[in-house]
UniProtKB/Swiss-Prot annotation:
GO terms for cellular component: plasma membrane. Residues 414-434 are annotated as: Disordered. HAMAP family: Ser_Thr_transp_SstT. Keywords: Amino-acid transport, Cell membrane, Membrane, Symport, Transmembrane, Transmembrane helix, Transport. It is found in: Cell membrane. The chain crosses the membrane at residues 14-34, 41-61, 72-92, 135-155, 172-192, 210-230, 282-302, 316-336, 351-371. The lineage of its organism: Bacteria, Bacillati, Bacillota, Bacilli, Lactobacillales. This is Serine/threonine transporter SstT. InterPro entries: Na-dicarboxylate_symporter (IPR001991), Na:dicarbo_symporter_sf (IPR036458), Ser_Thr_transp_SstT (IPR023025). NCBIfam families: PRK13628.1. It is a multi-pass membrane protein. Involved in the import of serine and threonine into the cell, with the concomitant import of sodium (symport system). GO terms for biological process: serine transport; threonine transport.
Length: 434
């Protein structure tokens, strides 16, 4: 029974959940027992999210390899830069178009809104070095991020077996989180019923404004910010490659809503472009967890919308801090459907917003997630391919072997690009040395 339920498209189930929740919220707002479904769903997410974030970041950091003969260094710089620039763009858009949400039962004042720079820094440092076990139990995401980065760095020195164990643990917890997310339609019924019964249709309409802001920002980043980065690296027209990656990778990712599922598609597309197999065989799978520009946008915009709703003044310093925090914490979630939403409590804690309030916003995220998560995944997955190709073309340009990107894209579309295997790359390198 569960297998048959799981085989049904999550998007279809969520759409049905939205319709059922909306109908029940309007027709029978007094049936408060329906709200329990939302509470159970949010409670399960609240329980699994800290462990999931901890293991994913730790696993991603432990896989970093240095010294390999590939374009890995350039790819990493592009991945991290793209995620950071995405977060900055999201914060800028949030300042230009501030949005307030309607949260049932939420007070308009944060628990402990930071008052000055000294208080913020002291609080951040104190929270970051908290006991890691307590952090997992209490949901202290700043400490979770800090310790996962340190432990992940330490794991780089361990054996492959140890790293495999950590990866398998992360995969196991991810599978548990995926099973919880499978029940999102039931949770959405409860959450939407509660929202409609307590805030009315007007409150729910604010979610549409939030969705439009999220999607518009992601489109702007992929069609303006990312192409500018490609141009800076290659000094060629970036749009043939940008649109091609969007077509071959972004469209499939939009419907699968999973960067991990899209990895084989990106690997084939890299081969079609004639990229170095030794390079893309590493960067594409890593991009499934390390390149999360779409996730950074979601975390930044939804966190600032929460801060606006709670009446928290966001200074320039805190906004910049949010950019870095969103960029770092987004590492590891692009391969999970709805994974970025689980990072909102960590980002919200920066402004003294309680975990309970933040999880209400996570619930809103799942309501709009049919579109938001699909667009986010498309941006993340397509940019994995975009920056993998850009890194190789940029390195070739620096070495005095510029590549005609438009011709490469055209050849890839016809399936006539020359494939660069590790053996061919080594032969070319040896001939240059001679």
């Amino acid at each position: 029974m569960y297998k048959r339920y799981k085989d049904v498209s999550l998007i279809l189930k969520i759409v049905i959940g939205i319709i059922v929740g909306a109908v029940l919220g309007v027709m029978v707002p007094s049936w408060s027992f329906i709200d329990v479904l939302g509470k159970l769903f949010v409670g399960a997410l609240k329980a699994i999210a800290p462990l999931l974030v901890f293991l994913l970041i730790m696993s991603a950091i432990s896989k970093y390899r240095s010294g390999a003969k590939n374009h890995f260094g350039t790819v990493i710089v592009l991945y991290l830069s793209a995620t950071l620039f995405s977060s900055i763009a999201a914060v800028a858009v949030s300042y230009l178009f501030p949005i307030k949400l309607v949260l049932p039962g939420a007070m308009k004042i944060a628990e402990s809104a930071p008052k000055d720079l000294g208080t913020v820094v002291t609080s951040l440092l104190t929270n970051a070095v908290a006991n890691p076990i307590s952090a997992l139990v209490e949901g202290n995401y700043l400490a979770i991020l800090f310790w996962s980065l340190l432990i992940g760095s330490g794991l780089r020195l361990t054996s492959a077996v140890t790293k495999k164990v950590v990866t398998e643990l992360a995969d196991t917890v991810s599978a548990v989180a995926q099973n919880v997310i499978q029940f999102a339609p039931f949770g959405i019924v409860g959450l939407l019923h509660e929202s409609l019964s307590k805030t009315g249709v007007k409150g729910v309409m604010a979610y549409g404004q939030l969705l439009m802001l999220l999607v518009a920002t992601m489109v702007f980043v992929y069609l303006v910010v990312y192409p500018f980065m490609v141009w800076l690296m290659t000094r060629q027209n970036p749009y043939p490659l940008t649109f091609w990656t969007l077509k071959v990778s972004g469209i499939p990712a939009f419907f699968t809503r999973s960067g991990a599922v899209n990895i084989p598609i990106n690997l084939k597309a890299s081969k079609d472009l004639g990229l170095n197999e030794e390079s893309y065989a590493i960067s594409i799978p890593l991009g499934g967890s390390a390149n999360s520009g779409g996730a950074a946008i979601t975390v930044s915009i939804m966190t600032l919308a929460t801060a606006n709703t709670m009446g928290v003044h966001v200074s320039i310093f805190l906004a910049l801090l949010l950019c870095f925090l969103s960029a770092i914490s987004a590492t590891g979630v692009s391969g999970i459907a709805g994974g970025s939403l689980l990072l909102i409590p960590m980002a919200a804690s920066l402004f003294g917003i309680s975990n309970d309030i933040a999880m209400q916003v996570v619930g809103i995220g799942f309501i709009i997630g049919v579109v938001q998560d699909s667009v986010e995944t498309a941006v993340n997955s397509a940019s994995d391919l975009l920056f993998t190709a850009t890194a190789e073309y940029a390195d070739d340009r620096r070495e005095g072997h510029p590549v005609d990107i438009r011709a490469k894209v055209k050849a890839a579309g016809k399936g006539t690009a020359e494939v660069v295997t590790p053996e061919k790359a080594n032969e070319a390198e040896e001939s240059e040395q001679v």
